């Protein structure tokens, strides 16, 4: 559960309505893989990740980034039940993919940076604070099934 004021929730959902999920998702996942290269080990099947340009131009990275932000959108629609919303993804990432749950926090922080870049002055410090609460809640929900 994420504790947002009514104003914060409105601001988060209003901005999210302007997000180009295809573009932002690919950029966020790509930046995660470039900035934290050890995360690439989970994406070896994506092909060429040999350089920042290769990562950022990789169509599989872009497609998976879109998928990730689609799940994030679902979370925004269910802020009062993030653990339930992400239960299956948590189990998948824990039991089958063996993803370090710290990576969820890292991706959330990268997403906030990408949103700030895309929205400039519209992404106020107050809006950033609200998004930090949301990405922390999502990361916590995704880590829930870990033992």
From Swiss-Prot:
Belongs to the globin family. The modification Phosphoserine is found at residue 45. The modification N6-acetyllysine is found at residues 60, 83, 145. Involved in oxygen transport from the lung to the various peripheral tissues. The modification S-nitrosocysteine is found at residue 94. One of its GO terms (cellular component) is hemoglobin complex. It comes from Ateles paniscus. Heme b binds at residues 64, 93. The modification Phosphothreonine is found at residue 13. One of its GO terms (biological process) is hydrogen peroxide catabolic process. It holds the Pfam family Globin. This is Hemoglobin subunit beta. Residues 3-147 form the Globin domain. It comes from the Eukaryota. The lineage of its organism: Eukaryota, Metazoa, Chordata, Craniata, Vertebrata. PROSITE patterns: GLOBIN. InterPro entries: Globin, Globin-like_sf, Globin/Proto, Hemoglobin_b, Hemoglobin_oxygen_transport.
